[in-house]
């Protein structure tokens, strides 16, 4: 519709302008009618009031003059008055005739209509003729007391002329009255025409205004109903595919365009949220796998730690046995001369035991080194977990921002994003705690390795001394003092080894405890990843409720 090309402001302006224009036309018509009526009224006044008053004055003097003449005629009868004939003749000449002339001249001058002016002039000329031919002779006869002549003139000339002049004057008055009636009728017709024109303009303005307003209101109602239905449908179905298609340039089209832009942005945001949710689910699954792997590695490490502890306990028993044997060797040294052969066997046994100790120390060193390697692996895994936690936190922050943009519809998604961010923060904190434990575990592992190396060095020394003892058995009788010194050294070394073994045992127990804690952390991480997967699933459901 062409009306849709106008804005609401212009529609309302048109709806108001039409009756306003109609009112202007009514006002213009009223002013025009009033102007015409005023002109007609002025014309009626100019053509009627003064001319009729002057003509009426002149007409009224005609019978008054006759009354004066009649009174002259009655002076010969019983009806005579005190003035007498001569007095009345004088009054007629000095007053009645001049006043009649003046009235006739005023009547002629006051006429506006040329035809009436001409008739008034004829009446004036007839009066002058009557004065010359009838009144003057008749007045002269009255003055000469010639009543017979006066009566004859009165009867034969003046009376017919009087009737003729009365008739002419009445005709002029009738014409003036007809003219006034015509002008009044024209004024009434102008009034009726103006009123009819005003009624037509008012009716046309009202009809056009009603039709225009009806068209505007119907169009607005249909367009508003379309907006309401489409928006209600989109809100009820959570459809992000809904678009408002309105033609025109009014504000409703602007609302439709703004709504479409809003839906496009929300659609894009929900699609990004869906992609991020899938990526979050993948990361949660990866974190869960890493957590299970960490838990498995912790279990394996715990088993190996138990093995190391067992070996350390055996090493401690061996060291104790070496110490006991060293004490026995001190006693037996006194009898070395008699038991040199037996001493060789003892020395050989000592060598075997020491070699076993060396092997056990090597195994312990390998186990501890493997433990350090596993710890480094755990540290790398924790770095991965920390990176995942940071990415999860970042994704949760982005999700919260997008939820805030979504407004009321993204409130549930904002709660989910906040829960994900909280879990990511807890995972990061747990990762930092695990990192601290691993750092302590690495330190203790390093110390354990150093202690193992010292023990191995001492074992090498013992092996060397045992070899020398085996070689010196032939000289054992002469070197008993030296053997006693060596036994003392062996006792001292075994005591140191016992101390080192106890330290290693404690370190292994600490490692075992740390491994247990790491396993618990891995369990929590696994549960956190499961919760993250559950939240991701809920997020997918929320996203799935939208029609993309």
UniProtKB/Swiss-Prot annotation:
<dbReference type="GO" id="GO:0004888">
    <property type="term" value="F:transmembrane signaling receptor activity"/>
</dbReference>
<dbReference type="InterPro" id="IPR024478">
    <property type="entry name" value="HlyB_4HB_MCP"/>
</dbReference>
<feature type="transmembrane region" description="Helical">
    <location>
        <begin position="11"/>
        <end position="31"/>
    </location>
</feature>
<feature type="transmembrane region" description="Helical">
    <location>
        <begin position="200"/>
        <end position="220"/>
    </location>
</feature>
<feature type="topological domain" description="Periplasmic">
    <location>
        <begin position="32"/>
        <end position="199"/>
    </location>
</feature>
<dbReference type="InterPro" id="IPR004090">
    <property type="entry name" value="Chemotax_Me-accpt_rcpt"/>
</dbReference>
<dbReference type="Pfam" id="PF00672">
    <property type="entry name" value="HAMP"/>
</dbReference>
<keyword id="KW-1003">Cell membrane</keyword>
<keyword id="KW-0145">Chemotaxis</keyword>
<feature type="domain" description="Methyl-accepting transducer">
    <location>
        <begin position="276"/>
        <end position="512"/>
    </location>
</feature>
<dbReference type="InterPro" id="IPR004089">
    <property type="entry name" value="MCPsignal_dom"/>
</dbReference>
<keyword id="KW-0997">Cell inner membrane</keyword>
<dbReference type="GO" id="GO:0006935">
    <property type="term" value="P:chemotaxis"/>
</dbReference>
<keyword id="KW-0812">Transmembrane</keyword>
<dbReference type="GO" id="GO:0005886">
    <property type="term" value="C:plasma membrane"/>
</dbReference>
<feature type="domain" description="HAMP">
    <location>
        <begin position="218"/>
        <end position="271"/>
    </location>
</feature>
<dbReference type="Pfam" id="PF12729">
    <property type="entry name" value="4HB_MCP_1"/>
</dbReference>
<dbReference type="InterPro" id="IPR000727">
    <property type="entry name" value="T_SNARE_dom"/>
</dbReference>
<feature type="topological domain" description="Cytoplasmic">
    <location>
        <begin position="1"/>
        <end position="10"/>
    </location>
</feature>
<comment type="function">
    <text>Chemotactic-signal transducers respond to changes in the concentration of attractants and repellents in the environment, transduce a signal from the outside to the inside of the cell, and facilitate sensory adaptation through the variation of the level of methylation.</text>
</comment>
<comment type="similarity">
    <text>Belongs to the methyl-accepting chemotaxis (MCP) protein family.</text>
</comment>
<keyword id="KW-0472">Membrane</keyword>
<keyword id="KW-0488">Methylation</keyword>
<dbReference type="GO" id="GO:0007165">
    <property type="term" value="P:signal transduction"/>
</dbReference>
<keyword id="KW-1133">Transmembrane helix</keyword>
<dbReference type="Pfam" id="PF00015">
    <property type="entry name" value="MCPsignal"/>
</dbReference>
<feature type="topological domain" description="Cytoplasmic">
    <location>
        <begin position="221"/>
        <end position="548"/>
    </location>
</feature>
<dbReference type="InterPro" id="IPR003660">
    <property type="entry name" value="HAMP_dom"/>
</dbReference>
<protein>
    <recommendedName>
        <fullName>Methyl-accepting chemotaxis protein HlyB</fullName>
    </recommendedName>
</protein>
<keyword id="KW-0807">Transducer</keyword>
């Amino acid at each position: 519709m062409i009306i849709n090309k106008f804005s609401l402001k212009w529609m309302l302006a048109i709806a108001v302008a039409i009756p306003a224009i109609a009112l202007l036309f009514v006002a213009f018509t009223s002013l025009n009618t009033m102007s015409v009526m005023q002109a007609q009224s002025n014309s009626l006044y100019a053509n009627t009031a003064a001319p009729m008053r002057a003509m009426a004055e002149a007409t009224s003097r005609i019978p008054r003059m006759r009354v004066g003449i009649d009174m002259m005629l009655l002076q010969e009868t019983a009806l005579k008055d005190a003035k007498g004939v001569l007095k009345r003749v004088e009054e007629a000449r000095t007053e009645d005739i001049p006043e009649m002339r003046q009235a006739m001249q005023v009547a002629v001058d006051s006429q506006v209509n040329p035809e009436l002016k001409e008739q008034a002039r004829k009446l004036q000329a007839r009066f002058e003729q009557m004065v010359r031919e009838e009144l003057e002779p008749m007045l002269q006869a009255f003055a000469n007391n010639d009543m017979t002549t006066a009566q004859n003139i009165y009867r034969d000339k003046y009376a017919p002329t009087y009737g003729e002049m009365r008739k002419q004057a009445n005709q002029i008055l009738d014409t003036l009255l007809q003219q006034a009636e015509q002008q009044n009728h024209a004024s009434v017709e102008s009034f009726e025409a103006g009123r009819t024109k005003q009624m037509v303009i008012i009716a046309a303005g009202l009809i056009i205004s009603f039709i225009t307003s009806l068209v505007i209101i119907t169009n607005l109602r249909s367009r508003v109903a379309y907006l309401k239905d489409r928006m209600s449908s989109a809100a009820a179905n959570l459809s992000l595919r809904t678009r408002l298609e309105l033609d025109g340039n009014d504000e409703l089209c602007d609302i439709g365009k703004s709504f479409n832009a809003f839906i496009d942005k929300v659609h894009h945001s929900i699609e990004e949220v869906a992609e991020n949710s899938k990526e979050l689910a993948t990361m949660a699954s990866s974190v869960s796998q890493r957590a299970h792997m960490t838990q498995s590695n912790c279990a394996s490490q715990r088993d190996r730690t138990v093995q190391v502890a067992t070996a350390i306990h055996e090493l401690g028993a061996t060291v104790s046995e070496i110490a006991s044997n060293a004490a026995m060797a001190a006693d037996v040294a006194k009898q070395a001369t008699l038991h040199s052969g037996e001493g060789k066997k003892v020395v050989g046994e000592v060598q075997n035991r020491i070699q076993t100790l060396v092997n056990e120390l090597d195994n312990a060193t390998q186990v501890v080194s493997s433990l350090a390697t596993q710890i480094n692996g755990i540290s790398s895994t924790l770095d991965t977990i920390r990176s995942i936690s940071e990415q999860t936190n970042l994704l949760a922050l982005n999700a919260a921002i997008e939820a805030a943009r979504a407004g009321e519809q993204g409130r549930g998604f904002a709660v989910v994003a906040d829960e994900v961010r909280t879990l990511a923060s807890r995972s990061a904190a747990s990762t930092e705690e695990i990192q601290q434990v691993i750092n302590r575990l690495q330190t203790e592992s390093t110390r354990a390795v150093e202690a193992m190396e010292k023990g191995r060095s001492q074992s090498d020394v013992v092996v060397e001394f045992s070899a020398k003892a085996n070689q010196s058995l032939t000289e054992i009788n002469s070197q008993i003092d030296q053997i006693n010194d060596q036994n003392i050294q062996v006792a001292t070394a075994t005591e140191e080894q016992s101390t080192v073994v106890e330290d290693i045992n404690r370190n292994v127990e600490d490692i075992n405890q740390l491994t247990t804690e790491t396993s618990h952390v891995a369990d929590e991480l696994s549960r956190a990843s499961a919760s993250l997967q559950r939240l991701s699933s809920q997020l997918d459901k929320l996203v799935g409720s939208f029609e993309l």
